């Protein structure tokens, strides 16, 4: 498992956030940070020489065979090279910078996508709870990709509609739900295994009473949940939008007991994402 020191991360993050630097410098910083993320993805030690466009990364990307990952690397490599060559006389535009930042977030998202290809999303409630501490923009990227490959996974759908709400708007979330009404109405709000556990725990009579009061299908559940959560956000504002705003919650409630490999691996990814970030204190 790759371990990195927080100091370089802090320097990179806050050089970007301060904003009093050119787009060229920002892209150079993002390229450097992206190389750190790639070391994490491919478990390349700091002592081993590596660049985004180098043969080491090209070989590793081929082995992964994931277009989401390779597309992000292509963007970072292309813009990074263009803006570090001295013969380029024009400054990168804000749109170009946005493309590079988006690709950087794709790399962070891939860490989780790769994890959930190994451990199916929704199989562990503790992992799901900690996953929700990630900023909504990053969750949206991850869940969008996972949904395309597992469209009947009710845990993905449940988290996805809330990520759309928190990253975009109530209208966007409701539109997404309505566009998939027919398919969502065919999905139960719980798996067969969960229903069987409920019956074993509470008995058939109490379980049936519980089942009768829950939403009839995923369309109804998602629609109601978006309406209710949107109302809470209107009253209280969002809990967090960035890593910095979420870090206090992550530190206090986001570290899983390392009792199995699934938790050890997830802790490693979460710690990597929050490494070097300052806490913006909020009340939870």
Residue positions per predicted region:
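Amphipathic alpha-helical interface elements
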Residues: 1-78, 85-284
């Amino acid at each position: 498992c790759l371990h990195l020191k927080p100091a370089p991360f802090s320097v990179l993050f806050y050089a970007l956030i301060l904003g009093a630097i050119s787009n060229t410098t920002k892209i150079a910083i993002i390229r450097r940070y992206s190389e750190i993320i790639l070391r994490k993805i491919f478990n390349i030690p700091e002592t081993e020489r590596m660049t985004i466009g180098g043969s080491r990364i090209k070989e590793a990307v081929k082995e992964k065979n994931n277009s989401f990952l390779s597309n992000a690397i292509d963007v970072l490599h292309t813009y990074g090279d263009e803006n570090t060559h001295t013969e380029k006389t024009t400054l990168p535009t804000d749109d170009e910078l946005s493309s590079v930042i988006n690709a950087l977030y794709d790399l962070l998202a891939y860490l989780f996508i790769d994890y959930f290809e190994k451990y199916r999303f929704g199989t562990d409630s503790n992992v799901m709870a900690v996953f929700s501490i990630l900023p909504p923009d990053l969750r949206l990227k991850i869940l969008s990709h996972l949904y395309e490959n597992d469209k009947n996974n009710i845990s993905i759908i449940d988290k996805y509609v809330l990520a759309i709400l928190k990253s975009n708007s109530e209208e966007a979330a409701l539109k997404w739900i309505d566009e998939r009404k027919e398919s969502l109405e065919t999905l139960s709000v719980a798996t067969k295994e969960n229903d069987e556990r409920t019956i074993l725990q509470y008995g058939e009579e109490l379980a049936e009473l519980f089942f009768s009061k829950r939403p009839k299908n995923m369309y109804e559940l998602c629609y109601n949940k978006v309406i209710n959560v949107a109302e809470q956000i209107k009253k209280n504002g969002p809990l967090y939008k960035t890593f910095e705003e979420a870090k206090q919650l992550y530190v206090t409630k986001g570290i899983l007991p390392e009792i199995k490999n699934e938790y050890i691996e997830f802790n490693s990814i979460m710690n990597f994402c929050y490494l070097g970030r300052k806490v913006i204190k909020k009340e939870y």
